[in-house]
Amino acid sequence: MARLLLVDIGNSRIKWAIKDSLVFTAAAPRVHRGHQLSDLLDMDWGHIIAPDRIFISSVNIPALRSELDSWAALHWQLAPHYLVSSRRECGVVNAYDNAETLGSDRWAAMLAAFHQQQGAVCVIDCGTAITVDVISNEGRHLGGLILPGMIGMQSSLFQQTSLQPVAIKPVALTTLLGSNTHDCISLGIQHTLSALFVRLMMYLREELDTEPTCYLTGGDALAIQSLLPSATRYDPHLVLKGLALVASNA
């Protein structure tokens, strides 16, 4: 089997893994925002055995792709394959009017979750943005949601008001109301998300006539996991596993 380098480039972080035969080895993620990507690649990839193929899910930032393409060409004489969402793949049918406009990270995560579950799933990616995607038992993508992540919610509040920026940490949801500014902000964000997820699960039970299994991934997944009204499965490598699935069928 070919040695695959799988790469997930989000708005803030880069994650990667090597898949060789049946072995899947994921590296620790790195923050790329504010850094020279080529320097990070030197540190992480400069010492590894060259892959046979590179499969990438990436946000649409041309400068990042250009740096990555140049690095792969210089060091390995390889041209990466960038995942583009399609109408149908690996048993999942895309709900978007224009299939290619669905984020490739969302598509990869959906493919991996449905492949693992072989049934209805709700995929929640908790990164810079929070995305939600739902797939039926038959593999039909019902659509999704996009909203600001927890840090984005905090940042917009500080930018649009006279509140002084402070580091906001999650507060135990033992009460609805806070008694200081920090707790008021933290509880406001958490209860907003919690209410959304409760409403979402109620809707999906009616729409699907079953309760889908929720898969969580992304940097804030563990912080958000407790806000879900039903059992969840946390998988930090969901996008990378989706890329591996696509690569195995390429």
What do these predicted regions represent?
Residues M1, C90-V121, G242-A250:
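Conserved phosphate-binding catalytic cores of ATP/NTP-utilizing and phosphoryl-transfer enzymes
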Residues M1-E89:
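N-terminal glycine/serine-rich phosphate-binding loop of ATP-dependent small-molecule kinases
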Residues M1-F24, A113, Q117-H141, L157, ...:
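Gly/Thr-rich phosphate-binding beta-strand-loop-beta motif of the actin/hexokinase/Hsp70
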Residues R13, S57-L64, E211-L227:
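Glycine-rich phosphate-binding loops at beta-strand->alpha-helix junctions
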Residues A28, L173-T213, A231:
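Adenine-nucleotide phosphate-binding core of ATP-dependent small-molecule kinases
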Residues L78, D97-A99, P229-P236:
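Active-site regions of enzymes building and remodeling cell-envelope glycoconjugates
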Residues L102, L111, H115-Q118, L142-S186, ...:
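Glycine-rich phosphate-binding loop plus the immediately following alpha-helix
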Residues S162, T232-A250:
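Glycine-rich phosphate-binding/hydrolytic loop that grips phosphoryl groups
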